Amino acid sequence: MFFKKNKKKETSSMANGEDTKKLDKKELIDEAENLINTIDSVSGDERIKVLNRIGSLYFEADKIDDAIKYYEISISENKSLGKAYTELVKLYNIKRKEAISKKDDESMKHYIEKIDSLLQLSKDVIRGRV
C-alpha cells in the first residue's frame, strides 16, 4: 500500500517503436562543419554560442582535439565561466588520463598546466580581474 512502485507509462514514441537515438558520429561532424562555415557571419554572443555548439558536437563525436580547439577559441573571445569552461576541464582531464596511460610525461604536464590556467581564469573572473 505505502511502498508500491508506480509503473511507468510508455510514451507514444516507445509504443510506436521509434527510437530517440543520438545522431551518429558522421552526422555530428557534418553539423559541426556546417556551423564552422557560419562562424565568420556571426559575432558577439551568437558567435560564442556557435563556437560552443561546435565544441559540443565534436565532443559528442569523440573528436577531443577538435572540441578543445573550438572551446579554447570560445574562452579566448569571452573570458567567462560557462559551458566552454566546464567542458574544457573535462576534455583536459580526458587528455591527461590518456597521457598517463601512455606514460607520456610531457603531455601529462601540458594538460595539467592547461587545467591550472583554467583554474586561474576562474579565480580572475570571480575576482573581477577579467
Task: Show where each model-derived region lies.
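Conserved structural position within tetratricopeptide repeats
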Residues: N37-S41, I75-S76, H110, S117-Q120, ...
